[in-house]
Amino acid sequence: SLRHRWLDDFFIVLTQLGYRAPMTLWGVLVTLALLLQRNTYAATLWVGTLLLGQTLLVGLKQWIAWPRPNLVAMPPESWAFPSGHTTMGLVFLGTLTILCLPGVPGRRQKAILSAVCILATTIAAARLYLTVHWPTDILGGLLLGGMILACLHTLVLQRPFRTVRPWPLIAATLAAWVISLFTWVVPHYGDIVHRYLPLSLS
């Protein structure tokens, strides 16, 4: 089996941070960080892109209605295609990157882009590792997220935003992850692990 305890723990924690409550907290804290910089346009871009991503994601899931693989004790209840974690993980990270990069020195931009790509790929891989998605769901999520980011990039090229100070946004992101970890993951970890047990072990 490809399942190992330390990988289970890593991917389960990562995937739990991609559910609605943690992502909502992340979105709210970054919005506040942008508003505290009095950068209303950048805040509007942030919120608008996230809402567009969520709307398209839910619409496609309901329209395609593709069932998930039935390989774990308690598969998520939503439809499989496209992967919501993959889509919104890419949209959140990509939008944050588009907003932050102009305020980052050039020599650090490649490092940030590499880190974002690795994290987005790892989020997608977590859903495959936990066997709650088909590979096509992940591909669909990457394509949908990429299309949304391409639209945002085009808009920003036509109507640039005032440079954002990146560190408050990064701090807001880290705060959201830590709060979410100790609010929605750690206290319920035993039950969460049970959901992802392979059927042969549940």
Predicted features along the sequence, with ranges:
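Hydrophobic alpha-helical bundle signature of multipass membrane enzymes
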Residues: S1-W79, T87-V91, T95-P102, G106, ...
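Membrane-embedded catalytic cores of phosphoryl/pyrophosphoryl-handling enzymes
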Residues: N70-L197
